[in-house]
């Protein structure tokens, strides 16, 4: 089957004038659009039917030919081809421009591509294009030489003529007996005049010599030179001049010249030559011609892509493009007319400039000068505006399409549903499944045809709902809650038809969707094809999505009422009815409870299945009944954390279906016993502790002392502030302890907080104790505590202070949401082509995972290595036993064994060191945390990584902490810190780090503070003497370089005979040690670095400390670029992973290291070429690391010199824009710049990522196995059914 979509790459390049003409169906010569009386397009206008095709299907403009039978005929009267009206969406026209025009993308970009190629500044280029200056386009060297000679001859002739004239005059004056003074005056005047004449001629000669191709001339200079030397040079202005210059460029010669320049120059000139060389190479490789950047023919967009629609009042609404095209055509026609009638040059020049401006506005309105407005102040949307931004073609229509077979409604809780089900309102389901219901009605003979089936559905007859029930049985639906932050925000459910208008959602999936029932809405989508249904059922069903892909923790854990119910069920109540009774087995105990003889929470003794006597409660027996037999009896209180652990363990034992059944049972238990517990909260449940008054009074006293000391000048403002804060923090902790000690363990408030259902001790402290210290909007703690509790009520001042935090919280949430969303978008873009494409890349490299020194800052080693593959044997330090072999997965048992063995570092495979040239391999990635197994082939791990980091972004704080009282340092934390790291920006407070190993010396004097690092490395140079040689030096003697150390001892010959080149000479200066036939010279190489320390920075080292390169000398954050340059690639990767992990872990968000490693890998995947060697690479070019290694390997195999390069750390935005796929980069940011570069380089998009395939409408490369099978099956089915007549009016997917 030959499909339009059957291609695997897309190339973009510059269009030549001939290509533009070949696309066109005719020239647009008139600015008219449609005739306002007949409402038909004007001939040769912007909507002409002859050029673009008929307005009505198979009907020409004059009406001579109608119907499909005339298809392909061109009407002899009106010239319109008989075809479908939809050809007006694809047929283009063209405008033959009266003069060449510069394409604004190539003339005005930064840097300007035309300017770079012609070595012109943007300012000079603008002067030429907009007809202000002339540029020399050609110089005739022979004519110049001849002109110079002629000038010299003219000069000599003039001087000679003038000389003879003066001689005649002098002779005449002598004859008239004139004074000597008068004669001398004439001679002096002649001398001055001769000098002036020579000077004028020399100036003209210099001007001639200075005439070079590409030089700019003002109008006056041009006319002056043209008058005298019209045959020496040619100059012109406008895009015409540039077209001429660009067409003269010989790319091969230009390349050789620039290569020479990059090697022989340095600094700014070399940098510019490097950029020019890259551009020249781009034109050479892409077979684009530079003159195509100047347009002589302008393509005209098909009319249906710039429509004109009649409104109700008879007026017309039109696309802005039509107005912009109209301006171009009007000016072009006027210019042609002026040129034909031979108008003055100045008028023609002005019209040419106006044409250039009109074309600029059409291509990119507002890039130069004032934007062209239509209808008053509304800025016209140009072709570039249609592509760029959120509302542009890429993001609005290609990446974010609206879909049919979808609906939306409010969600309510569905406590009676199974985990895999959702409640779908009948009316909604009927509309969504309408075609399927109609098809079934016809098939079952309930309706004779589709039309009557539609009528039956619209009347909603009872048999229709019976059919609907059958249809939805085998068709899952997708539920989506916006914002779709991660994979779990879209899940598949089996629909259960319900009455009412609201969707019903299972309470356990709420946390995955981050949904609650306060008015949230969700969207429903219907998977249509068999492949889609199969994928939804096998991978998207909620029972297959119970674990978080970010951390591997359960996401379907019970919450709120369910947690409280389970906690209440498993707690004990001393003195309850039936306490101390003994039962023979669990069933007997449950029977006695049901008869009301014993209380649910009474402590009883029961014999378990193994014959052991347990002290437990009936509630715990009931709870354990729902757990699998493999899980031992849980004889304890079950709060939220315990439920999470139990679910995690059960997931490894049970299948998805059994797991769902167990979770549903826990849910039912939770709801049942939360209801029967009869929990409620009253004001009386919150009691203020008696100790509060004393503690507050003591704190007030300590505060008064600090204030008094400050008033007397004994302590500073900082010390006073810190003392007060410390006092009240301590008091708050003591009151919290007092509240906890006085709690009624059976009280509803305590049980709610302790179970993890709702609330925590901090909130109870604010209700019963005191609210404590508050922060101001900048994040600084206010040194005025709120001493009242919410139970007692706040004073007006206390209430005012507490509003600061509340308002800041709301503002933060709003800002965080957008910031987090943008971060996720950038992360998605940088990793969207990271897909598992290989089983094993075979690398021996890996990364060391080390037990963190600061507990609580990073996850423990056991958590970080779980699910990874080893890159080396893991050996028990005491016994020498191999715990895990090389290249083997570390599962829970092995991870536990590693922890118990006391191993503090493990060498594991990592995405950072994966050597797959495209995507990644399974072993380096390891376990898919959401599925708890080795990652499947074709999994889009890049997207998963981006979602895992972006999704909890809204939970991160948005503030920079202000430390140390009044004058302090801002420490960036939370979301801004994550962004700072991923964008590889210099930190706000940048730490100074040592570039070398050495010893510290801290210097403080009137010039400020300095740190000097001195490094003394001692080396040895050894010289082994042959036997019979005589040493010329002694031990501990100092020798200089070049000094003789030993010489051969020759008998009977004088010393003069011994050749000097036979002696052993010292290669270095140092101290000698002689030991037999071995001479050793010890020498040291010292290195020193000095750093100036700003006054606000805190020094972290002291004099005499020995430090390593890369170690911090001051507080603050390290610039990742410094780590890369000093310590290299591995160190910067480790730094990025650990720093991002610290931010999330400190906020209680668990993300696996591998997700951050995937991003870090993409940030370091490019290298910058230093020297090209024998390769085609250009110095300064950014190249993919793997491509660079491949090119070098080929060159080395052929015996050539390889290129050299250094690793580049790029921020995620830059990395996204420098991706191999130009489609993905253009749809991200800076659309016009990306497309400009891609066109010049003639880039080929191999369609290896996800975005580029979504844009062109192909299936993404990350397909699951079942989906691939179903797609093949469907293609075969369609091929088989192509010959059979389809049932009229049915969707293709019903086949």
Swiss-Prot record:
Mg(2+) binds at residues 516, 518, 520. Zn(2+) 2 binds at residues 841, 914, 921, 924. GO terms for biological process: DNA-templated transcription. Its EC number is 2.7.7.6. One of its GO terms (molecular function) is zinc ion binding. Zn(2+) 1 binds at residues 60, 62, 75, 78. GO terms for cellular component: DNA-directed RNA polymerase complex. Binds 1 Mg(2+) ion per subunit. Binds 2 Zn(2+) ions per subunit. It catalyses: RNA(n) + a ribonucleoside 5'-triphosphate = RNA(n+1) + diphosphate. It is an enzyme of class 2 (transferase). Belongs to the RNA polymerase beta' chain family. The RNAP catalytic core consists of 2 alpha, 1 beta, 1 beta' and 1 omega subunit. When a sigma factor is associated with the core the holoenzyme is formed, which can initiate transcription. DNA-dependent RNA polymerase catalyzes the transcription of DNA into RNA using the four ribonucleoside triphosphates as substrates. This is DNA-directed RNA polymerase subunit beta'. It comes from Dehalococcoides mccartyi (strain CBDB1). The gene is rpoC.
